[in-house]
Amino acid sequence: MSRMAEQQLYINGGYTSATSGRTFETINPATGEVLATVQAAGREDVDRAVESAQRGQKIWAAMTAMERSRILRRAVDLLRQRNDELARLETLDTGKPLSETAAVDIVTGADVLEYYAGLIPALEGSQIPLRDSSFVYTRREPLGVVAGIGAWNYPIQIALWKSAPALAAGNAMIFKPSEVTPLTALKLAEIYSEAGLPDGVFNVLPGIGAETGQYLTEHPGIAKISFTGGVASGKKVMANSAASSLKEVTMELGGKSPLIIADDADLDLAADIAMMANFYSSGQVCTNGTRVFVPAKQKAEFEHKILERVGRIRPGDLFADDTNFGPLVSFPHRDNVLRYIESGKREGARLLCGGEALKGDGFDNGAWVAPTVFTDCSDEMTIVREEIFGPVMSILSYTDEAEVIRRANATEYGLAAGVVTPNLNRAHRLIHQLEAGICWINSWGESPAEMPVGGYKHSGIGRENGVMTLQSYTQVKSIQVEMGKFQSIF
């Protein structure tokens, strides 16, 4: 593949060179080839983007709800028309198979934008009667300029999850994609402009997270930060946001989620769910159910079914129709995942399969790790306690409900959880005791536009998707109207 042209920043409706003079490279993780050199935004570029966003936001917010809705719907149409083009670029940048990016990444992002475009006319205030001569009414007004900071695992989907409610509510957004996967966010900016979004309402600033991201969190002209990433980075973002100007924050952070297989579960269904909860996107999904709790008496049979299904994983050419497993997103991340795997071996977990980098057959130059399953795991092991963000499943056995609930909740995380059982009374009883913000019964992983998603504990603050997220991008103004005679005590 030929190297792409140097990528610039997208500010005020068009591409512009970074003033910092700094660049970084984005890599195809399947082959190790450089895809493009990307310009990195500096502090002056953030200032330019904020000024542009402030101008554009005034124009955008002054439009009627239906005008804004039509523009966002045009962007939805453009996304769907260009699905294949965007999916191919996402595959090159992330290492996900085309079978995945073409069916999920752009499609689900467009769904969220369509959902919020439809909600714009329904964004309304309320009227509260006080007495015959007086009433209060409320208005939901935009925050102004907000910033989104994305993660590298779902680049365009995350950009849409953050920008859709923000723009629908009348805000402007400055989006910083991960430096690991920056390419499709720039294409999204082009699409928004083509759809008719006023200049400056959606700006994209590629850059190094510790620098560009910090400039955004510290900028007094930004009213809110929506961040997706790790817990440690999220705490820094939150601290900077509070110290600078008491910004509002939404945080979608890490997870170490439990998947509980009940003793009455269909083990074939349970194994299918566990595979999707661990190996989809090569395990690089924040909600993955990496702690798989299985009744002790059924563990051996469950292990057998998992190994059967691991045999159906097909790594290879990312553009081949039958490939369903790709490399990890980068070489540093691959090395980190391999270190976790070695810790599992060292701490006494029994390795059922994988446990190493994939070699040969075109894998040598990429960031490939074999699908890995550990069993006989215990709660204190590093692979059970810490988020790995790779294709590593840990199987743990349990004896009764009280035990498995206690152990499932014994984590600083609280992003997701799941239960597999045909007994819905039991399913609800278990789910209601689990400390997690996103839960599934007899399923895993679907996050439709209508469903609020977010975590408990260290897994985040606030929600993405759903009606409540649209409201979180507004501020409420209360107005009392007095129609009678005003009484003064002076």
Swiss-Prot record:
Tree of life domain: Bacteria
Pathway it works in: Amine and polyamine biosynthesis; betaine biosynthesis via choline pathway; betaine from betaine aldehyde: step 1/1
GO molecular function, one term: betaine-aldehyde dehydrogenase (NAD+) activity
UniProt keyword terms in alphabetical order: Metal-binding, NAD, NADP, Oxidation, Oxidoreductase, Potassium
Record's cofactor remark: Binds 2 potassium ions per subunit.
Residues reported to bind K(+) 1: 26-27, 93, 180
PROSITE patterns, per the entry: ALDEHYDE_DEHYDR_CYS (PS00070), ALDEHYDE_DEHYDR_GLU (PS00687)
Site-annotated residues for Seems to be a necessary countercharge to the potassium cations: 248
UniProt record, GO biological process: glycine betaine biosynthetic process from choline
Binding site for K(+) 2: 246, 457, 460
Binding site for NAD(+): 150-152, 176-179, 230-233, 254, 286, 387
Gene3D superfamilies: Aldehyde Dehydrogenase, Chain A, domain 1, Aldehyde Dehydrogenase, Chain A, domain 2
Catalytic activity, reaction form: betaine aldehyde + NAD(+) + H2O = glycine betaine + NADH + 2 H(+)
Main enzyme class: oxidoreductase
Pfam families, alphabetized: Aldedh
Active-site annotation: 162, 252, 286, 464
Modified residues (Cysteine sulfenic acid (-SOH)): 286
EC numbers on record: 1.2.1.8
CC cofactor: K(+)
Quaternary state and interactors: Dimer of dimers.
Family: Belongs to the aldehyde dehydrogenase family.
Known role: Involved in the biosynthesis of the osmoprotectant glycine betaine. Catalyzes the irreversible oxidation of betaine aldehyde to the corresponding acid.
Record protein name field: Betaine aldehyde dehydrogenase
Organism (species): Klebsiella pneumoniae (strain 342)
Encoding gene, per UniProt annotation: betB
